[in-house]
């Protein structure tokens, strides 16, 4: 049986990269914020002025509640604060969900940096990638530029091995979504076998069908 088969349409996820420094072309910075007992709890970071950002968030009424998104205007591009809830209650799934919400708020932007990975790099990568996942299928109408999903997200950090593993996980989930979203008229038992064989060969694995 031939392993040559391609899905009629593929979903899109942003380009993901890791950097120890703020990229010069970043149009926005996404940061996490906790819901503190006495107001906002903003994690410290070397990549922004916490005092200034905290004051702006307070002025805008941000609370840090889970999945709340607040955008702070800045001369170098907006700072997008996404709430992750109370610090003691945070776990990987809550961070993943918050990252997904943040990703969906970044439409129209080309390059964005984020410090979300400082709270958990794997969950942040998976949340951003899958939150921004877009599947248009048979739709052919052009999408206005300001409604396009974010094109590239740079995670500020240094753990390349953990980042690479998270990217692989996100890509695998996105591919599974492609299979679910594909029209049933385009998929049949032989095509699933061909897809599995092709994926195995691409990763230097052997497969028997």
Regions found by a protein language model. Give the residues of each.
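Glycine-/small-residue-enriched capping loops at alpha/beta junctions
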Residues: 1-209
């Amino acid at each position: 049986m031939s392993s040559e088969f391609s899905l009629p349409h593929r979903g899109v996820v942003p380009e993901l990269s890791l950097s120890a420094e703020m990229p010069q072309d970043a149009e926005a910075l996404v940061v996490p914020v906790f819901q503190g007992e006495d107001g906002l709890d903003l994690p410290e970071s070397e990549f922004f002025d916490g005092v200034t950002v905290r004051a702006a968030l307070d002025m805008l009424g941000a609370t840090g509640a889970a999945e709340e998104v607040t955008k702070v205007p800045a001369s170098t591009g907006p700072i997008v604060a996404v709430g992750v809830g109370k610090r003691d209650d945070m776990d990987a799934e809550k961070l993943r969900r918050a990252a997904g919400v943040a990703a969906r708020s970044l439409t129209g932007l080309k390059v964005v940096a984020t410090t979300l990975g400082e709270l958990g790099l794997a969950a942040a990568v998976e949340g951003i990638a899958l939150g921004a996942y877009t599947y248009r299928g048979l739709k052919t109408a052009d999408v206005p530029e300001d409604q396009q999903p974010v094109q590239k997200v740079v995670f500020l950090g240094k753990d390349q091995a953990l980042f690479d593993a998270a990217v692989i996980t996100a890509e695998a989930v996105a591919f599974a979504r492609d299979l679910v979203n594909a029209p049933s008229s385009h998929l049949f038992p032989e095509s699933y076998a061909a897809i599995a064989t092709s994926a195995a060969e691409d990763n230097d694995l052997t497969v028997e069908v």
